[in-house]
């Protein structure tokens, strides 16, 4: 029981930090028409939503989220100077119970199911549910800004505006960790669908496209190592591509490969 209580305290702290980081990032990007999304990966579906025969109740993470979001607004609202943003936050449409949702596996009857026993099969069935709202999630007219998922969303979801990833679980599977962290490694887009890359932002591309991982210690160590590995891998890459880069670089041509691209 003590262990469970201590873990709940840790998870609540992670949720709180994710919300605060989200609000600060959202404050910075709101006027530029860039919607900020946060993604939570959870251990079991019933940690977020508990299904009865004909009803569904909020799980502990959903309750924690709404409590901590309301608390964060009370603490931070007076520090926000952008009146358009404060009106956005105060809009009843953006009340705590409306801004989060869970995307999980679904059975043939369209009901959410616990996927821990048939993880691969059920995650695959859940991808379609996530993809249906992919573009709508990027609009401020959609109140959902916080997403809870059981799966790693590996090849089924590619939303560019995930700025925070919070892992409310522990795992030693490094492949799955890479899949989860990879959900936030995208160049964001604004409300016009314009990708915020170096052509648009110049050097500020690095100030805008920042991913924050709020994690337990195992994920924190992993994220730092991944960042180091990526920095080392990119260090030797040329900043500008010129003709001299390809001097004396001869490579065999694969006609099978070319045909594959043409078809």
Per-segment meaning from a language model:
Residues 1-147, 155, 171-172:
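Conserved C-terminal RecA-like helicase domain
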Residues 49, 222-224:
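Extracytoplasmic/secreted cell-surface and envelope-processing proteins
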């Amino acid at each position: 029981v003590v262990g469970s209580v201590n873990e709940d305290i840790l998870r609540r702290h992670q949720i709180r930090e994710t919300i605060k980081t989200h609000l600060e990032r959202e404050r910075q990007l709101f006027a530029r028409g860039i919607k900020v999304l946060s993604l939570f990966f959870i251990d079991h579906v019933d940690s977020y939503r508990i299904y009865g025969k004909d009803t569904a109740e909020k799980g502990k993470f959903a309750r924690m989220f709404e409590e901590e979001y309301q608390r964060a607004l009370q603490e931070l609202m007076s520090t926000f100077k952008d009146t358009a943003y404060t009106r956005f936050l105060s809009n009843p449409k953006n009340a705590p119970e409306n801004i989060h949702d869970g995307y999980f596996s679904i059975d043939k009857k369209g009901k959410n199911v616990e996927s821990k026993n048939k993880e691969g099969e059920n995650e695959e069935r859940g991808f379609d549910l996530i993809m249906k709202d992919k573009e709508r999630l990027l609009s401020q007219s959609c109140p959902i800004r916080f997403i809870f998922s059981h799966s790693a969303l590996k090849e089924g979801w590619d939303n560019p505006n995930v700025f925070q990833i919070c892992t409310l679980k522990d795992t030693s599977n490094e492949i799955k960790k890479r899949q989860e962290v990879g959900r936030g490694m995208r160049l964001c887009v604004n409300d016009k669908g314009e990708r915020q890359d170096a052509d648009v932002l110049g050097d500020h591309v690095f100030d805008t496209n920042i991913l924050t991982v709020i994690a337990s210690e195992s994920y924190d160590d992993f994220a730092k190592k991944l960042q180091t590995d990526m920095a080392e891998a990119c260090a030797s890459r040329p900043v500008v591509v010129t003709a001299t880069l390809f001097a004396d670089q001869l490579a065999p041509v694969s006609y099978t490969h070319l045909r594959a691209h043409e078809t």
